[in-house]
């Protein structure tokens, strides 16, 4: 019996025409990294039997509202979960900084997306214990941070993952490491599998 209850919507980072979305030396491009990770994820998820869609597959930026409309318009009987993949930055892309780590954003308030993001957060932290994980509250009780980012505000559950800082030299090296990128994909898959099981047991019955 197919217990794939999720429709995964992959949302790549900003297009190649958005300025500042790269490392200060220009050797790392967020739009390329994100699209490559999304392609790997889509292939693995398809093999596992998931329904997979993209908000955009082009290199240029379609606009945040168009991304949201694309996700809103996907017809499915499954529970829609949008995952937006980005790299973080402490500046505008012109200088190196020391800020580091991982953040996950969801829409404001207590929602089902918070539960899903906490599950993903826990999986990533388990698989990458040496990384700094940034909490949404000073007491570390809230894993995700709240934001009214356009892509988080549709008719679906959603999380935006800021994976490492593209203006931190050490983390840029990690973003270029194929082994680390593959491990990141595998960790995301495990997180999605856990979320899917939760949806199957609690939301689809």
PLM feature segments, named:
Residues 15-17, 58-62, 87-93, 109-112, ...:
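Solvent-exposed loop/turn segments at secondary-structure junctions
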Residues 9, 22, 28, 84, ...:
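Active-site-adjacent mobile loop/cap segments within catalytic or ligand-binding domains
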Residues 7-11, 51-56, 79-85, 103-106, ...:
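Structural recognition of the beta-strand scaffold that forms the well-ordered cores
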Residues 64-79, 148-154:
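Mature extracellular/periplasmic domains of secretome proteins
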Residues 38, 42, 65-68, 113-121, ...:
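Extracytoplasmic/secreted envelope proteins and their assembly/folding machinery
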Residues 112-141:
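Active-site-adjacent substrate-binding region
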């Amino acid at each position: 019996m197919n217990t794939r209850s999720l429709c995964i919507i992959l949302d790549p980072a900003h297009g190649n025409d958005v300025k500042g979305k790269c490392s200060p030396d220009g050797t790392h491009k967020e739009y390329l990294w994100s699209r490559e990770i999304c392609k790997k994820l889509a292939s693995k998820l398809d093999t596992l039997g998931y329904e997979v869609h993209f908000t955009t597959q082009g290199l240029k930026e379609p606009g945040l509202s168009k991304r949201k409309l694309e996700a809103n318009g996907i017809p499915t009987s499954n529970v829609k979960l949008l995952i937006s993949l980005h790299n973080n930055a402490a500046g505008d892309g012109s200088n190196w900084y020391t800020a580091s780590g991982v953040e996950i954003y969801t829409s404001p308030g207590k929602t089902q997306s918070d539960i899903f993001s906490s599950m993903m957060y826990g999986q990533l932290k388990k698989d990458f214990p040496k990384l700094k994980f940034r909490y949404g509250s000073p007491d570390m009780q809230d894993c995700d941070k709240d934001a009214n980012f356009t892509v988080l505000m549709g008719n679906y559950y959603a999380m935006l993952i800021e994976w490492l800082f593209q203006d931190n030299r050490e983390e840029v090296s990690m973003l270029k490491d194929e082994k680390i990128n593959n491990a990141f994909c595998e960790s995301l898959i495990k997180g999605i599998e856990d979320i899917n099981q939760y949806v199957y047991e609690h939301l689809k019955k």
